């Protein structure tokens, strides 16, 4: 290893996804990079971990790339756990995840394996950045690569508060160039319940696919959802910490404990 900072690179689209190669390529001059990513796509697995079967770590050869790459037959959170405890020679200064094919903005972060990989690191005291790109069907990663080094370099040079990480989303670029980057707040949008009922052609039982309908809201003008629709890239500082609703606790503690005891 050199004297450069060490960055762990991961994702949820899988170790051979184009997005992670573009992420690696965009920041390879900033730090020593080690890639530990899922063997297969693990989209929408959130912060799940594998506990009912063994996990395997395998060295991966990226053609035409001098990269240190490993795959894990598990989830993004599994990858981070094994990277920190088995693969990496030392503690990384930063973890980056992505570039995800499709945005992870609003409340969709709770489903995202891309974001969950960073959350796993944050819970172990390591800051991180999740990167996602709105062009799902035909992502032109080269159009957003130039924005990534500045964001990563800022994170390397400016310590985040404990429990904090950055969630970065790039808008679709099919309608024009990105207008700029905004540090902003999380919106409300998420994938709504929209199950599609289907009939098996050879069997009599029905089955369902969860649809891709979005639950839309009137978004604040400083939210990531609103700004992405306007063509801006968004950076939201998210926080993992005490989830207790303290105002509810203070208001209801006496009444609740009197009622149930």
UniProtKB/Swiss-Prot annotation:
Q: Where is the protein found, in the record's own terms? A: Cytoplasm
A GO term from the CC aspect: cytoplasm
EC number per UniProt = 3.1.3.5
Q: Name one GO molecular function term.
A: 5'-nucleotidase activity
Reactions that this protein is recorded to catalyse: a ribonucleoside 5'-phosphate + H2O = a ribonucleoside + phosphate
Disulfide partners: none
Cofactors required: a divalent metal cation
Record: residues binding a divalent metal cation: 12-13, 43, 100
Name one matching Pfam family.
SurE
Cofactor remark from the record:
Binds 1 divalent metal cation per subunit.
Q: Which residues form the signal peptide?
A: none
Q: Which InterPro entries match?
A: SurE, SurE-like_Pase/nucleotidase, SurE-like_sf
Question: What keywords appear on the UniProt entry?
Answer: Cytoplasm, Hydrolase, Metal-binding, Nucleotide-binding
The Swiss-Prot or TrEMBL record describes its family as follows: Belongs to the SurE nucleotidase family.
Q: What is its biological role? A: Nucleotidase that shows phosphatase activity on nucleoside 5'-monophosphates.
Q: NCBIfam families, per this entry?
A: PRK00346.1-4, surE
Q: What is this protein called?
A: 5'-nucleotidase SurE
């Amino acid at each position: 290893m050199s004297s450069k900072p060490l960055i762990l690179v991961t994702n949820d689209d899988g170790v051979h996804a184009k997005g992670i190669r573009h992420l690696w390529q965009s920041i390879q001059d900033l730090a020593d990079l080690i890639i530990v990513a899922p063997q297969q796509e693990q989209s929408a697995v959130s912060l799940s971990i594998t506990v009912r079967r063994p996990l395997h770590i395998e060295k991966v050869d990226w053609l035409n790339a001098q990269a240190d790459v490993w795959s894990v037959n598990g989830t993004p959170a599994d990858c981070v756990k094994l990277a920190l405890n088995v693969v990496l020679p030392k503690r990384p200064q930063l973890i980056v995840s992505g570039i995800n094919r499709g945005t992870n903005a609003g409340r969709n972060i709770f489903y995202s394996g891309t974001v969950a990989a960073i959350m796993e690191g944050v819970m172990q005291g390591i800051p991180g950045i999740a990167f996602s790109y709105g062009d799902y069907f035909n992502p032109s990663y080269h159009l957003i690569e130039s924005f990534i080094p500045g964001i990563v370099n800022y994170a390397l040079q400016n310590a985040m508060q404990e429990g904090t990480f950055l969630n970065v989303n790039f808008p679709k670029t099919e309608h024009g160039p990105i207008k700029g980057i905004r540090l902003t707040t999380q919106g409300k949008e998420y994938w709504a319940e929209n199950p599609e009922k289907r009939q098996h052609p050879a069997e009599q039982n029905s089955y369902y696919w969860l649809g891709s309908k979005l639950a839309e809201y009137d978004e604040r003008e400083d939210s990531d959802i609103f700004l992405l629709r306007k063509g801006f890239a968004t950076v939201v500082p998210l926080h993992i910490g005490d989830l207790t609703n303290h105002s509810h606790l203070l208001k209801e503690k006496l009444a609740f404990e009197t009622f149930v005891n």
